[in-house]
Curated annotation (Swiss-Prot):
InterPro entries in alphabetical order: ATP-synt_VA_C, ATPase_a/bsu_AS, ATPase_F1/V1/A1_a/bsu_N, ATPase_F1/V1/A1_a/bsu_nucl-bd, ATPase_V1-cplx_bsu, P-loop_NTPase, V-ATPase_su_B/beta
Record family assignment: Belongs to the ATPase alpha/beta chains family.
GO cellular component: proton-transporting V-type ATPase, V1 domain
PROSITE patterns: ATPASE_ALPHA_BETA
Organism for this UniProt entry: Hordeum vulgare
Subunit structure: V-ATPase is a heteromultimeric enzyme composed of a peripheral catalytic V1 complex (main components: subunits A, B, C, D, E, and F) attached to an integral membrane V0 proton pore complex (main component: the proteolipid protein).
Name of protein: V-type proton ATPase subunit B 2
HAMAP family per the UniProt record, alphabetical: ATP_synth_B_arch (MF_00310)
Protein purpose: Non-catalytic subunit of the peripheral V1 complex of vacuolar ATPase. V-ATPase is responsible for acidifying a variety of intracellular compartments in eukaryotic cells.
PANTHER family: V-TYPE PROTON ATPASE SUBUNIT B (PTHR43389), VACUOLAR PROTON PUMP SUBUNIT B (PTHR43389:SF18)
Length: 483
């Protein structure tokens, strides 16, 4: 199958020397016979260099082509354009684990070329909705605020909402280091024998990042020995903007192959989706389309959905794809089109907070605006622990009340607060200092995080823990009276 597909991509099509204009990353061609939407073209410049492009728009005998490597040096005298008759396909193989590629999928780690097991369309194959399986079973990140209060189900898509200057890269690297499937103590031996740990893989796609960030991730994966289960795709800030549009699609095509053909549980991390949205806006402006909110194209919601909706699980296939896109909110504005539309498509969000960061709390995850919509299906008896849901609800309630008391204290002073209010203030401080805060290399499994949560909840008398049933309190509250 693979050789035939390869042969198709090499099929020589018609060549044209009819470039009529260049606009930003786009080339306009006239007198083209039968161009196809999304067809791949090879552009040969006067100096002999070749670039790749893709047909974006067809109007009779006119074709608009976006050039992945940029349009500098393209003229209407010496440039020839060859239409291949193929859509953009990427070679995929199990050997891609442990390798580093550029945003177009070419190896940049001085290793040998990939021997492809298949060539797959980067837009992905459509999935029958009735064949999708509901995401279940928790992915453990080792970060208490995520695991206890915003649990991520296998097959979920949940973004990190961050902003400039916040440690989203460090959090993403920590998740990559620590992420794995939940194992009970009595199950860990069995899981090790069954090779469950070997079944976990990470596909990491960086779009528009600077060299420092790219080196940080590369070094982090290599130093921690997790590189062998990671595939990296790096589109740097000085790489062509247009390449950012295909980078997440190539990464997801690789993830789909690893998940559905190789049976792996794949975690896909996409950073920074704001750079992707800006690339989309640049192409839209070059095409002179009617702009939407803040200059972004009106179809950005649909376009983002074609990326995010590729997460999930399929009936009869062992693997799964879990997505954690990272986006930086310009001016910390959650109403900006990119986070706004992302929030509509994805199943929750994890909010990285500047105030917590300014107080030297790492990871600065604010649990109040954070949400995991599929948490209920990933936790509970048999998956984590029977008290998980109740503990999470009680932590949310007490933290929210603690925030209100803190605001009231600023107005009326501490003397006017009741003894009950002071308990909430004590909880607020200990929750942020002991539960939210943890080291970048401090891994807590879900059972350690739940035990830590109970230590904090014992600050309160039983009567104030309204969200936890009496049966659960009988089992867990009196284990250890100290706090």
């Amino acid at each position: 199958m693979a050789p035939e597909m390869e042969e198709g991509t090499l099929e020589i099509g018609m060549e044209y020397r009819t470039v009529s204009g260049v606009a930003g990353p786009l080339v306009i061609l006239d007198k083209v016979k039968g161009p196809k939407y999304q067809e791949i073209v090879n552009i040969r410049l006067g100096d002999g260099t070749t670039r790749r492009g893709q047909v974006l728009e067809v109007d009779g005998e006119k074709a608009v082509v976006q050039v992945f490597e940029g349009t500098s040096g393209i003229d209407n005298k010496y440039t020839t354009v060859q239409f291949t008759g193929e859509v953009l396909k990427t070679p995929v193989s199990l050997d891609m684990l442990g390798r580093i590629f550029n945003g177009s999928g070419k190896p940049i780690d001085n290793g040998p070329p990939i021997l492809p097991e298949a060539y797959l369309d980067i837009s992905g194959s459509s999935i029958n909705p009735s064949e999708r399986t509901y995401p279940e079973e928790m992915i453990q990140t080792g970060i208490s605020t995520i695991d206890v209060m915003n649990s991520i189900a296998r097959g979920q898509k949940i973004p990190l909402f961050s902003a400039a200057g916040l440690p989203h890269n460090e959090i993403a690297a920590q998740i990559c280091r620590q992420a794995g499937l939940v194992k009970r103590l009595e199950q860990s031996k069995h899981a090790a024998e069954g090779g469950e740990e070997d079944n976990f893989a990470i596909v990491f796609a960086a779009m528009g990042v600077n060299m420092e960030t790219a080196q940080f991730f590369k070094r982090d994966f290599e130093e921690n020995g997790s590189m062998e289960r990671v595939t990296l795709f790096l589109n740097l800030a000085n790489d062509p903007t247009i390449e950012r549009i295909i980078t997440p699609r190539i990464a997801l095509t690789t993830a789909e192959y690893l998940a559905y053909e190789c049976g792996k549980h794949v975690l896909v991390i996409l950073t920074d989706m704001s750079s992707y949205a800006d690339a989309l806006r640049e192409v839209s402006a070059a095409r002179e389309e009617v702009p939407g909110r803040r200059g972004y194209p009106g179809y950005m919601y649909t376009d983002l959905a074609t990326i995010y909706e590729r997460a999930g699980r399929i009936e009869g296939r062992k693997g799964s794809i879990t997505q954690i896109p990272i986006l930086t909110m310009p001016n910390d504005d959650i109403t900006h089109p990119t986070p706004d539309l992302t929030g509509y498509i994805t199943e929750g969000q994890i909010y990285i907070d500047r105030q917590l960061h300014n107080r030297q709390i790492y990871p600065p995850i604010n649990v109040l605006p954070s949400l995991s919509r599929l948490m209920k299906s990933a936790i509970g008896e048999g998956m984590t622990r029977r008290d998980h849901s109740d503990v999470s609800n009680q932590l949310y309630a007490n933290y929210a009340i603690g925030k209100d008391v803190q605001a009231m204290k600023a107005v009326v002073g501490e003397e006017a607060l009741s003894s009950e209010d002071l308990l909430y203030l004590e909880f607020l401080d200990k929750f942020e200092r002991k539960f939210v805060a943890q080291g970048a290399y401090d891994t807590r499994n879900i059972f350690q995080s739940l035990d830590l949560a109970w230590t904090l909840l014992r600050i309160f008398p039983r009567e104030l823990l309204h969200r936890i049933p009496a049966k659960t309190l009988d089992q867990f509250y009196s284990r250890d009276a100290t706090h």
